[in-house]
A protein has these predicted regions:
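Secretory/organelle targeting and membrane-embedding segments
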Residues: 1-115, 119-287
Length: 287
């Protein structure tokens, strides 16, 4: 979308970093395959795709190996613009990566770092991670994101609520009796078993994606439709939620795992039968 709409600067470059020992060309092929899979045919443009692919380079690197950060340094040596580091990795590696980037002296006041949820396993670990990030980045340099907010349906919620007079005047407790949010997936873990089993649906989906949806649905109209105004109203919703007690968990919560079944005429293995699964796992896939 950004490439097609001309929102990317001509000098923008993208460096993919992972342990897989493949060439830049092989990595680019993976990107093309992903675009073909996830971009609808009506929007897919070969010329736009080729332009995007030319921006992409690849670096094979073990983020746990301090010596490998010199490979990243070499790959970035010709870059002159400020760099944003997108950490799509387990949160327990955030500090390791920050230490590694700092060791090759490429972090500046213009650097930015992007971290995705879940940021930690619980409140204590989340605070610890944020403290570690602040060793190298100021608050204005840190972007904590939830990719779910980029979905078209979620984006449309704000327009539906606040730019449509038909709904904006009726979207209140007098007209709405209750709210039910269902987030149903058409796929299973799809190769993410190693990550997901240590997180579970409550941490992976409920405390991030679902709470974000709840905030957008329940918040009051912000005084300004900008980042600060929307964030402020979301916080008010979260502070107004009734804390969950042990009795609530006992009486009102159901946890489960999906079993062998069929999705869109395709047979799918149950959670405990997925590739790499631990048959003794009690991690929830349904809440």
């Amino acid at each position: 979308y950004l490439e097609r709409s001309g929102k990317l600067d001509d000098s923008l470059k993208i460096l993919g970093v992972a342990r897989q020992d493949i060439s830049t060309e092989q990595f680019q092929e993976k990107v093309v395959d992903a675009l073909n899979m996830y971009v609808s045919s009506e929007y897919f443009d070969v010329e736009v795709c080729n332009k995007l692919i030319k921006r992409i380079d690849y670096c094979c690197c073990d983020l746990k190996n301090p010596d490998d950060y010199q490979k990243i340094n070499s790959s970035l040596s010709s870059w002159s613009k400020p760099i944003a580091y997108y950490l799509a990795i387990p949160p327990n590696l955030f500090e390791t990566v920050c230490d590694g980037l700092n060791s090759i002296q490429i972090l500046t006041n213009e650097s930015r770092i992007v971290v995705e949820k879940p940021i930690g396993y619980n409140l204590d670990s989340s605070r610890e991670i944020n403290d570690k990030l602040s060793k190298y980045f100021s608050e204005s340099q840190i972007y904590r994101i939830d990719h779910y907010l980029g979905k078209e349906t979620v984006q449309n919620l704000i327009t539906l609520r606040f730019a449509n007079s038909l709904f904006s005047s009726q979207w209140n407790s007098k007209s709405i009796e209750y709210i039910e949010i269902t987030a149903a997936e058409s796929v299973g873990i799809e190769g993410r078993w190693g990550y997901f089993d240590g997180v579970g649906q409550m941490r992976d989906m409920v405390q991030s994606h679902i709470l974000q949806l709840l905030c957008l649905i329940a918040m009051e109209p912000p005084s300004r439709l900008n980042d600060e105004g929307i964030r402020s109203e979301k916080v008010k919703v979260l502070k107004a939620l009734r804390p969950i007690t042990d009795d609530d968990i006992e009486d009102s919560f159901i946890k489960a795992q999906y079993s062998d079944g069929q999705i869109l005429d395709n047979k799918k293995p149950g959670y405990l039968n997925e590739e790499g699964a631990n048959s003794e796992s009690t991690t929830e896939t349904f809440v």
